[in-house]
Amino acid sequence: MKILSFDVGIKNLAYCLLDTEDLTIDDWNIINISVDPTCDHVNKGKCCDKTATKMTKDSGFKLCTSHCKIKLYKDKKLRNVPKLDNRMLSLGNQIVKKLDEKKNFMNMDVVCIENQPALKNPTMKSVQMIIYSYFLMNGKAKDIQMINARNKLKVYTGPKIECDIKETYKRNKFLAIKYCDIMIRENTHIDKKFHKLYDDSKKKDDLSDAYLQGIYYINKLND
């Protein structure tokens, strides 16, 4: 059975496609669903991916808050980047487009989506429901599960990880990253290319959440 697990985000949508046999990973990555324009400044051949707040009046070259201040653009006439007329519609269209590109997602049996609080962050809740609606309407998922974020930390059964972080949110992020790092290396059936992907990622917290949530659901199936 194939389990497709999503960690919900407004800019980064992490996913993990797992096989219940041997708990192997078929696909694991981050989808950039941001609709906000990004900074065009290039440093050492790499384009800045931060959200642009200003743009040059002459060429429309976009800059983030940090790069607006550097000497190279100091004498440029800048204006604010125009706001999207309907950001939620643009975000919804972007999510559908990105999901359509992932043909292997249609091979899943169950979709797991991290449940979002409706009042605390309504945009995140909307993203959750767009993903839910997408898989509901294509009719191929046998089940779509909303998973409480607290459950992902329940899957680790190894030695206790020492952590002196008191703030709950940061503590949970730290532990999720540690748990995931240990678990993917202990499972010898997982392709080592995913070890490298995880090690190289700047979004280990999102990748961890998607993986651990999928494992939580699989464990529930076996209870």
Positions of predicted regions on the chain:
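Phosphate- and other anionic-substrate recognition elements at nucleic-acid/protein interfaces
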Residues: M1-D223
